[in-house]
Regions:
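Active-site entrance/lid segments in N-terminal catalytic domains of soluble metabolic enzymes
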Residues: 1-208
Length: 208
């Protein structure tokens, strides 16, 4: 057993210190960024914020609002199952939707969806424990079947596994185990990692 003695921080542990600015209004702030994804070969420009695929977050209304600001929405799973509009996003007969949508699911779910719909720009593998070999295998499988897709995979909280997912073919890594206010992973299993430290360490791993 290894006990880490380093200080680990959650977002609630820190504040953002203000500094001198030449901006005259908050409306002058431009958060647009451009990303070149290594594996998919795609270039994406927008505000790098993703709405989670949680039940009350990844909704059609959320998608409409975030699309106005060029942000990304991950539809909640129950929408993909019951709502044909979401389910058919990215297919050739429904081109109105599909921009800035990341279709996410578990290993079996996303494998089934990819079989029937190959036109999605973003495809996400979302499991509670991203440390299993099955996640690596799923990334490699989807990368082989849809090489032009930008793949999101997780969840992990450490640098070593972040690198493993990227090497397997993921373009974006989903970071976090148990940080949510309604998530019971930490209280029931004792497994987790302070979220701010997880994000910093996983991001640093990609700079090596």
């Amino acid at each position: 057993m290894l006990i880490s003695e380093d200080i680990k921080l959650d977002y609630s542990d820190v504040l953002i210190r203000p500094k001198r600015s030449t901006l005259t209004s908050r409306y002058d702030v431009d958060m647009t960024r451009t990303f070149n994804f290594v594996h998919s070969g795609r270039t994406w420009s927008g505000v790098p914020i993703m709405a989670s695929n949680m039940d009350t977050v990844g909704t059609p209304k959320m998608y409409e609002r975030l699309l106005e600001h060029n942000m990304i929405t991950c539809p909640a799973r129950h929408y993909m199952k019951k709502d044909a509009t979401w389910w058919r996003v990215g297919t050739t007969d429904n081109k109105m939707l599909g921009k800035n949508v990341c279709m996410m699911g578990g290993i079996d779910e996303i494998g089934h969806m990819v079989t029937h719909h190959l036109k999605w720009e973003f495809i996400g593998i979302d499991v509670a424990n991203g440390y299993t070999i099955s996640v690596i295998d799923a990334i490699k499988d989807i990368r082989l079947r849809v090489p032009e897709a930008t793949i999101v995979a997780g969840n992990v909280v450490t640098a070593d596994m972040t690198q493993e997912l990227i090497l397997a073919g993921a373009d974006i890594v989903k970071v976090g185990v148990g940080p949510g206010s309604v998530c019971t992973t930490r209280t029931k299993t004792g497994i987790g990692y302070p979220q701010l430290s997880a994000v910093i360490e996983c991001a640093d791993a990609l700079m090596d």
